[in-house]
Amino acid sequence: MKKLSILAGFVLLIFACKTDPGEKRITDPKDYDLHLSTTNRPTYEEAISSKEFWSKRLRPDSSGVGELGPLAGVYDLLFQTTGNPNFLRNAEKLYKKGMQISANDKDAFARGLAHNYISQHRFKEAYVLLQVTLEGPSNKHQTQLMLFDAAMEVGDYEKAYGYLGKIKNLKDYHYLIRLAKWSDHRGDLENAIHYLEEAKTIAESRDSKALKIWTYSNLGDYYGHAGRIKDSYELYLNTLALQPDNAYVMKSIAWIIYSEENNVQEAHRIMDSVMINHKLPDYHLFKAELYEFEGKVDFAKSSQIDFVNAVKDGKYGEMYNTFLIEIYSEAEPVKALKLAEREVQNRATPESYHLLALAQLKNGMTKEALRTIELYVEGKTCEPMALFHTTLVFKANELTDKVASVKKRLRDASFELGPLLTKKIETL
């Protein structure tokens, strides 16, 4: 998901700061227009068909073990294709039922449930479940793969590295994509890209559609982080060729059009199409940023409110805490602080702690915010929003030299941050 900034009340005419739309043109509507069709939904239609098939085979008392797993997987896929969290909860119930009644595949259902928990941002529950599963009869390799994922999510990096060592195999696709994630975590983007490119070669040699879709879209993200925007765009198009209704990739293309080309109207057009069938709340935040870029403050505020309401009405649980903390920090700082403290308990990572520091700062806790940054964020992540909030804390504490140092790093992340936040950084 792209990192979106919500800069309340910050309205600047910045069109002169970058080249005019067209001068840096990378994208072409002819490349993706076909995929904006709201009726071309092959992934969703296939998922619905599979749901009907497995539902009919499932016994009324849900006691058919062979049907529970596939049906739960279909519900997970339906969440991915619609953004409706009810599908995640449906899948959760089925995985739990499978663990309860299965004689031989409890660990497979446990891994499915753990993956479901991670999607719901219930990271600690996933981590504990996988640790228990590893101790019992299980496919150790598959469980250790997921334990790495869960350990990274909760910030247990020492254990994550240990799990990575246990599954080491440079010819294994699933090891390589995790090694890429570990490299990215350590700030080694060059090797992160290298390992994902190796994984891409394996996915293509197997001609696995699912693996190619995942690899192309994620490698496209890494290329974007590295400033290889054209390469990123090409991989997103490759993804759409395999999965025309991939909403994440369409949003990523819209981000290129906005952040790199300054073509706000085209970005709006893409997102308006995506949002018809795919209902993730954070799309409203992207729209808010586009409106703010145009100077349409009222529309931006309205879209931000739409986001908050969508999270509440959709019962998304903990899934959007990070975005809510940023929003609440401006208008309801006490609420932001409480939510940030809860998020740190759920996910003790630098990406959570920098939001805690932001909330502390907005509550006038300047020294506490600095302590949080120095203990849990500084030198522990290269994530642009973490660096931005670090800069705010350094400035509030009058650490001028540190502000200048971090600003240099942020300039290299202008594509990820977007033009609004990039301009804000220059004023610090």
Q: Would you name each region that the model predicts?
A:
Residues 59-62, 96-103, 131-138, 165-172, ...:
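Solenoid-like repeat scaffolds
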Residues 73, 80, 115, 149, ...:
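Residue-level recognition of tetratricopeptide repeat
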Residues 78, 82-85, 120, 154, ...:
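Structural motif corresponding to the intra-repeat A-B loop/turn of tetratricopeptide repeats
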Residues 30-31, 65, 102-110, 136-144, ...:
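Generic helix N-cap/helix-start motif at coil->alpha-helix transitions
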Residues 17-108, 128, 161, 404-428:
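N-terminal leader/linker segments that initiate helical-solenoid repeat arrays
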Residues 44-47, 81, 88, 123, ...:
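TPR-repeat structural position
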Residues 212-213, 308-364, 368-378:
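Alpha-helical adaptor scaffolds
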